[in-house]
Amino acid sequence: MEELYREIEIFSKWAETNYPELSENNDNGEWEMGVNSHFYEMCDAAVNVINEYESNKVDEKTIDSLLFVVARDSECEIIVEKLTLHKEWYELLAKKSFGSKYVNAEWQFAKHLGECKECDQNLIFSFIESDYEYTSRMALNTMADLKPDCAEEYAIRFWNRGKYPEGSYEDEYQKIMALNVLAKIKSKKLNEYLDKARNLKYKWLIENAEKIVQSIE
């Protein structure tokens, strides 16, 4: 454990010195490019904890530390992929990430849930309700694979819920994911929503609709 705490301290001091403007919500995840950042050493220390300790034997400090590292690894997503091989660890950290400040860990757990074959797939219903837009979007995509019978209902809800302002980035990308999920599950409502997409002034949504049409012709 001490190795993990030590590497996080070294990395955090480096990050505060070189990128003081970055935060949990404003983090591009490209820490692997940092010279002398100890990013890789920190990640290795996190993996060592996962491999050497049982998830039910660690305290909140360790859990918080692991979530911190997973969030920093949001560009490569290596640690969360390793966690898919450890059911208990994955489920523990996934649940702890819900609504936490570690938004860049939360969406990774939503995205990779299907790769953790023994994990409780119903966790996806928590992720899809996340207040963090990107987490909910990743969860909808994962739901298409894990719970296809539910995916159509959620995709349509995402399209129509009006959670984000009309014309916003968030609203457009929620609709893009909804459209792609309807296509993925071969929904009978796909054509209806392709027509809706064409009638909106969203450049990337229209482009996605055109690609979907081309793929099914």
Task: Go through each PLM region and give its residues.
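Extended amphipathic alpha-helical repeat scaffolds
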Residues: 1-40, 217
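Alpha-helical scaffold domains
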Residues: 3-13, 17, 100, 104-105, ...
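Generic structural signal for well-ordered, non-membrane alpha-helices
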Residues: 9, 13, 44, 85-88
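A general structural signal for well-ordered secondary-structure junctions
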Residues: 14-17, 21, 76, 89, ...
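Surface-exposed polar/charged interaction patches
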Residues: 14-17, 21, 52, 56, ...
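Structural detector for internal amphipathic alpha-helices that build alpha-solenoid repeat scaffolds
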Residues: 29-53, 64-85, 104-117, 136-149, ...
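Amphipathic alpha-helical scaffolding segments comprising HEAT/armadillo-like alpha-solenoid repeats
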Residues: 50-64, 85-99, 117-129, 148-164, ...
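Short inter-helical turns and helix N-cap capping residues of alpha-solenoid HEAT/ARM repeat scaffolds
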Residues: 101-102, 131-134, 162-163, 170-171, ...
